[in-house]
Amino acid sequence: MSSGWLTPGGYPAGIEQKILAGALDEGNRSGSRTRLLRFAPGVFTTAPFVHEYWEEVYLISGDLTVGNDAEGRGGENFPPGTYACRPPGAVHGPFKSNGGCLLYETHYYAG
């Protein structure tokens, strides 16, 4: 579990992913991917995300705040066990974690 973690493009240092299965081809809008995503304590993103694939997210452990401002303040807090399903085009984030967190995510194109 300690190897294979990389910071995804466009994410700040302290957020890392580990691809578990699959591959997502955003250019051809095909494929699927399963990954773990972890936030180090205190890390936050500064802008919302939007993409053209489905995303299902489960918060395994830690704390996650959604909707913070560019300085990491505010937002709505979510506990472990939280699940979200986002359709293509859904605006979501920014995100932060005060104590760090671990997420299980699936991304896929339907149809």
Residue ranges and their predicted role:
Residues 1-31:
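A short, N-terminal "cap"/entry segment at the start of jelly-roll beta-barrel domains
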Residues 3, 35, 46, 52-53, ...:
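Beta-strand-enriched cores of mature, soluble protein domains
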Residues 17-19, 34-38, 56, 83-85:
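Conserved hydrophobic/aromatic beta-strand scaffold that supports enzyme active sites
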Residues 39, 68-90, 96-97:
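Short acidic-glycine-tyrosine-enriched beta hairpin
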Residues 39-41, 109-110:
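Non-catalytic surface loops within mature trypsin-like serine protease
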Residues 41-45, 50-70:
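Glycine- and acidic-residue-biased ligand/ion/polar-headgroup-sensing regions
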Residues 56, 85-86, 98-111:
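A short hydrophobic beta-strand segment most commonly corresponding to one strand
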